Amino acid sequence: NLYQFKNMIQCANRGSRHWLAYADYGCYCGWGGSGTPVDELDRCCKTHDDCYTEAGK
C-alpha cells in the first residue's frame, strides 16, 4: 500500500528526496512494473511488487 511504499522509500534514501519523487521512478517504483530495475532502489521496489504478487496468490 501507499503507506508501506512511503516508509520503504524513506528508509532506502535516508530522506535525501521526498518520497513522492519516487512515485514514478525507474521501472518498478510506482504503479505496475516491468523490465530490468535501474538501480538498488528500483530493485527494492521490484521486491516489494513481487511480494504483493505472491501474497495475492
From Swiss-Prot:
Q: Which SMART domains match?
A: PA2c (SM00085)
- Which positions form S-S bridges? C29-C45
Main EC class the enzyme belongs to: hydrolase
| PROSITE patterns xref list | PA2_HIS
Keyword Secreted among UniProt keywords: yes
Gene Ontology biological-process annotations? arachidonate secretion; lipid catabolic process; phospholipid metabolic process
| Tissue-level expression | Expressed by the venom gland.
Organism superkingdom = Eukaryota
Q: Where is the protein situated, by its record's location annotation?
A: Secreted
State the GO CC annotations. extracellular region
Look up the record and name the cofactor or cofactors this protein needs: Ca(2+)
Major site of localization recorded for this protein? secreted
Extract the Pfam families matched here: Phospholip_A2_1 (PF00068)
GO MF term set: calcium ion binding; calcium-dependent phospholipase A2 activity; phospholipid binding; toxin activity
Record-annotated membrane-spanning stretches: none
Q: Which residues bind Ca(2+)?
A: Y28, G30, G32, D49
InterPro entries linked to this entry: PLipase_A2 (IPR001211), PLipase_A2_dom (IPR016090), PLipase_A2_dom_sf (IPR036444), PLipase_A2_His_AS (IPR033113)
Catalytic activity reads: a 1,2-diacyl-sn-glycero-3-phosphocholine + H2O = a 1-acyl-sn-glycero-3-phosphocholine + a fatty acid + H(+)
Q: In the UniProt entry, which residues are flagged as the active site?
A: H48
Give the E.C. number(s).
Answer: 3.1.1.4
Cite the SUPFAM superfamilies for this sequence. Answer: Phospholipase A2, PLA2 (SSF48619)
Cofactor binding mode, per the note? Binds 1 Ca(2+) ion.
What's its job? Snake venom phospholipase A2 (PLA2) that inhibits collagen-induced platelet aggregation. In terms of inhibition of platelet aggregation, superbin b is more potent as superbin c, and d. PLA2 catalyzes the calcium-dependent hydrolysis of the 2-acyl groups in 3-sn-phosphoglycerides.
Q: Which family does it belong to?
A: Belongs to the phospholipase A2 family. Group I subfamily. D49 sub-subfamily.
Q: What name goes with this protein?
A: Phospholipase A2 superbin b
* Species assigned in the record: Austrelaps superbus (Lowland copperhead snake)
| Upper lineage | Eukaryota, Metazoa, Chordata, Craniata, Vertebrata
